[in-house]
């Protein structure tokens, strides 16, 4: 009986040791890719995520695929190519999941960044219409406040890296949370 109890404790410890225990801070080295037009935040976010995972897909190629065109890589970019959209990871050999009008929980943020060691894309919906997509590449908790590290492809050809509170990631003045693309991985 004692041997069986000992074996059960060992099995439990082995199981628990395989669980991910996120640290207070974690980041992933995601290269900032500014959006190349005023509307390609979605393509820049797709480019950042896929580039991090080892596949370089340009923003104009994503626009060509999204809009059924072949001229979005031209200079200047034709106006018909300059539209909003969503990343289409499946067209480039990736699987992903996405939320609808909901952010990832803090535990999910930690799991994606620390445990799975990958970034994820998120978007805000502006109160007046339209929206904006960015990448979360890290997180930290300081003095009881949760923050996320963001690669923001705005402004065109510039971009920005910043840290925002988790609460601001969820919603804020002038915007609500839209869709997140997470668990992005090769098929």
Per-region residue spans from a language model:
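Proline-rich low-complexity regions
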Residues: 4, 31-32, 43, 119, ...
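Bacterial N-terminal signal peptides that target proteins for export
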Residues: 1-9
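Active-site nucleophile-adjacent alpha helix/oxyanion-hole segment immediately C-terminal to the catalytic cysteine
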Residues: 23-70
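C-terminal motif of bacterial Sec signal peptides marking the signal peptidase cleavage site
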Residues: 17-18
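Conserved active-site-adjacent core of cysteine acyl-enzyme catalytic domains
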Residues: 25, 50, 61-187
């Amino acid at each position: 009986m004692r041997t069986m109890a000992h074996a059960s404790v060992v099995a439990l410890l082995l199981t628990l040791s395989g669980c991910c225990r996120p640290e207070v801070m974690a980041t992933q080295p995601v290269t900032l890719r500014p959006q190349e037009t005023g509307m390609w935040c979605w393509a820049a976010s797709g480019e950042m995520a896929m580039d991090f995972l080892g596949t370089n897909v340009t923003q104009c190629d994503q626009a060509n695929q999204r809009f059924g065109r072949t001229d979005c890589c031209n200079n200047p970019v034709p106006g018909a190519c300059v539209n909003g959209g969503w990343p289409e990871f499946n067209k480039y050999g990736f699987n992903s999941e996405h939320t609808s009008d909901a952010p990832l929980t803090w535990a999910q943020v930690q799991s994606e960044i620390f445990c799975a060691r990958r970034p994820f894309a998120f978007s805000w919906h502006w109160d007046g219409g339209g929206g904006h997509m960015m990448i979360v590449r890290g997180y930290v908790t300081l003095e009881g406040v949760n923050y996320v590290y963001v690669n923001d492809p705005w402004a065109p050809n510039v971009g920005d890296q910043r840290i925002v509170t988790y609460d601001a990631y969820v919603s804020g003045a002038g915007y609500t949370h839209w869709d997140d693309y997470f668990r992005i991985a090769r098929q």
